Curated annotation (Swiss-Prot):
This is Uncharacterized protein C16H5.15. The keyword Repeat does not apply. The SMN complex catalyzes the assembly of small nuclear ribonucleoproteins (snRNPs), the building blocks of the spliceosome, and thereby plays an important role in the splicing of cellular pre-mRNAs. Most spliceosomal snRNPs contain a common set of Sm proteins SNRPB, SNRPD1, SNRPD2, SNRPD3, SNRPE, SNRPF and SNRPG that assemble in a heptameric protein ring on the Sm site of the small nuclear RNA to form the core snRNP (Sm core). The gene is gem8. It holds the Pfam family DUF3807.
Amino acid sequence: MSSEITEGDLQKFHDEHFNAKAVNLWNVAFAQNDRGGNSESANVEYTQSVERYPDGTIRTLTDEQILWFRESEKRELMWKKEKEQLLKEKELRQKALDKERMVSSKPETNPKTPISLKELKDIEIYQNQFHYSAYEILEEEKILDNIFRKFTALPIKYWPATPIRG
């Protein structure tokens, strides 16, 4: 078996792996200019072998590339719409949460006012219905108020947040 590669072997390999159009473009672009050939005739051959649009513009993208770009643009537009929709939903949720916070954070109109006789009668109705005395109901309300204060108080002191360095 001979380890030498002949010119015929190279020609056979070349013919099997490179198409005629690619070889022609290579020769037009590089080979003739290196040999000092006529560059104008090379440009004419090159421009004749390139695909053109009906208006004469040279076509630089294949149909597959154009399709891919269109699909990517469609995907990008869909993502933008989804993002806008998510932002709107988030904004609506935030507005609803802010409204809820405003309603729940309104101060009492008359805090720590003594209980009136009408309220005591209402408490007596509750006592008959739920079997609690007025005193027990008031104590339970105080306990619930204290629990509320405990959980809504901020345990963090914000000043100074970071050590002051000179």
